[in-house]
């Protein structure tokens, strides 16, 4: 006896999320990250973490970026004070993302927030949702 295929009710509705395709530039992503991280405040400081500047950079991030630069045989280095400088913070962000081969805005945002294994962390999914909301308000 052949199994019966289930039949769909005539008014069966499938709810699909709306699909919106938009290219996000690095500048747009960085602006969104700055708004999420510090509300666009270059002087922001979160004392419980030691996160400083527009991109809320930790001392460990500065050390990681300097380690990357040493491996690349670059003479360039960043100091903890450079976290307060927006342009230098953006440079550190770009060095970090390039080193870890982060390509998509989601990869960049989640790993910026959660480290090189950020894509594996649930907390960075919530962070990415905040960044996406910020990106939507920018456009």
Short names for language-model regions:
Residues 59-120, 128-138:
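Alpha-helical segment that forms one wall of the substrate-binding/catalytic cleft
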Residues 1-28, 136-139:
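N-terminal secretory targeting signals
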Residues 24-41, 57, 93, 108-116:
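Short, functionally critical alpha-helical segments immediately adjacent to catalytic or ligand/cofactor-binding
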Residues 42-43, 119-122:
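Extracytoplasmic/secreted cell-surface and envelope-processing proteins
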Residues 32-75:
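Secreted/periplasmic proteins that engage bacterial cell-wall peptidoglycan
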Residues 22-26, 48, 103-105:
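Extracellular/periplasmic catalytic domains that process cell-envelope and extracellular macromolecules
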């Amino acid at each position: 006896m052949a199994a019966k295929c289930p039949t769909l009710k005539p008014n069966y509705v499938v709810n699909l999320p709306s699909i919106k395709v938009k290219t996000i530039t690095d500048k747009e992503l960085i602006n969104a990250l700055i708004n999420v991280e510090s509300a666009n405040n270059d002087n922001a400081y979160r004392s419980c973490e030691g996160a400083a500047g527009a991109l809320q950079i930790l001392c460990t991030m500065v050390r990681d970026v300097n380690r990357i630069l040493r491996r690349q045989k670059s003479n360039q280095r960043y100091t903890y004070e450079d976290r307060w400088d927006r342009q230098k913070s953006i440079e550190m962000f770009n060095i970090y993302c390039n080193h870890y081969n982060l390509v998509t805005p989601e990869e960049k945002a989640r790993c910026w927030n959660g480290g090189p294994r950020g894509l594996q962390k649930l907390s960075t999914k919530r962070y990415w949702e905040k960044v996406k909301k910020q990106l939507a308000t920018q456009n």
